[in-house]
Amino acid sequence: MAAVATCGSVAASTGSAVATASKSNVTSFQRRGPRASVTNDSGPRLVSIAGTRPSVRNGQLLVSTGLPALDQLLGGGLAVGTVLLIEEDKYNIYSPLLFKYFLAEGIVNGHTLLVASAKEDPANILQELPAPLLDDKCKKEFDEDVYNHKTPESNIKMKIAWRYQLLPKMEIGPVSSSRFGHYYDASKRMPQELIEASNWHGFFLPEKISSTLKVEPCSLTPGYTKLLQFIQNIIYEEGFDGSNPQKKQRNILRIGIQNLGSPLWGDDICCAENGGNSHSLTKFLYVLRGLLRTSLSACIITMPTHLIQNKAIIARVTTLSDVVVGLESFIGSERETNPLYKDYHGLIHIRQIPRLNNLICDESDVKDLAFKLKRKLFTIERLHLPPDLSDTVSRSSKMDLAESAKRLGPGCGMMAGGKKHLDF
């Protein structure tokens, strides 16, 4: 009876404990996933900023470069806190377009701009930004431009090289203003209302320094020093420092530096192989990366690498940059008149892609890329050589057979008619 009473008391206590737990809804099971992060306010949350999105691979915050096709090649976009280096083409015709697309994307998304140049006033650069293409407003014009530049062979179903139809196609088409990445009309200028409503800062080198300053060996040039101080002040004063908590709404700072490393910036790497300022550019990039890593900012730099005399400096600059994209124009080269490249204006080379929070980079399988500037659009496409449908090959083979027949002589090179060549 004592044992039964003991069991009864244990059962009663267990029942009361279950009743108490059911009333308080307390359980030892905790769900791992989005719900747990929502209920826990102290956990880290991803910053939500207009014109950005997280990477599906490493969770890094991405911004668009202004060219959705280039975003696709870079793994979804340009990561915040990184440097995009554009190797200028020989005559500096197409690289300014990528520079302006990057700035125009920032204005459309409401980002803050910092434009630095030693050649052109930043205010004049903003006046030349392309106009954005949106869904309903410019869809008709976009379709007409694509239709006018579409090759007839693109509509024909492939019978021999049918495997090319299975390749993924580059994204092309206008999108809404709320989506990630936009398209722009290169034949029109951005409305003045958008430029006036934007928040931007300009750094024009001739207005910041005088020509009488002397540069000490193994130190930064005055232009690089002034620019770093200017960028640092904007990051800390405007609230783009990610290491310190900010009370106001977060935003992205887009930094654009034009013609960096050229003699206009007071650098001599384009004039001599072993100049006195050979380490000035690499020091500047090293300090710039330190500023970007701890801030909500992204930077694009155009550099005339084809003018740099010392190739070792180019290798160091590539290492200090996160993303390196090279433009090779056909102007002035043999490929300009080559019929194989008649549909393109140049080649684009993805030389380096960053490895951020990952062991490997999100590298595209496509290596052969070309670009062309249409009436309104700057497009990046896979390089496809046209099929050889001409009769030049057959004519050349006939001429070779005729010459060989003459050398062989009438005994074995002539047929019964005496006028026909040897046919294999």
Swiss-Prot record:
Keywords tagged on the record: Cytoplasm, Nucleus, tRNA processing
UniProt record, GO biological process: regulation of transcription by RNA polymerase II; regulation of translation; tRNA wobble uridine modification
* GO terms under cellular component: cytoplasm; elongator holoenzyme complex; nucleoplasm; transcription elongation factor complex
Q: Does the keyword Cytoplasm apply?
A: yes
Answer whether the UniProt record assigns the keyword Cytoplasm to this protein: yes
Q: Name one GO molecular function term.
A: phosphorylase kinase regulator activity
Question: Could you tell me in which tissues this protein is expressed?
Answer: Widely expressed.
Pathway(s) served: tRNA modification; 5-methoxycarbonylmethyl-2-thiouridine-tRNA biosynthesis
The leader peptide range reads none
Q: Which InterPro entries match?
A: Elongator_complex_protein_4 (IPR008728), P-loop_NTPase (IPR027417)
List S-S links within the chain.
Answer: none
Instruction: Describe the disease involvement stated in the record for this chain.
Output: Aniridia 2: A form of aniridia, a congenital, bilateral, panocular disorder characterized by complete absence of the iris or extreme iris hypoplasia. Aniridia is not just an isolated defect in iris development but it is associated with macular and optic nerve hypoplasia, cataract, corneal changes, nystagmus. Visual acuity is generally low but is unrelated to the degree of iris hypoplasia. Glaucoma is a secondary problem causing additional visual loss over time.
Could you say which protein family the record assigns here? Belongs to the ELP4 family.
Q: How does it assemble?
A: Component of the elongator complex which consists of ELP1, ELP2, ELP3, ELP4, ELP5 and ELP6.
Q: What is this protein called?
A: Elongator complex protein 4
Organism of origin is Homo sapiens (Human)
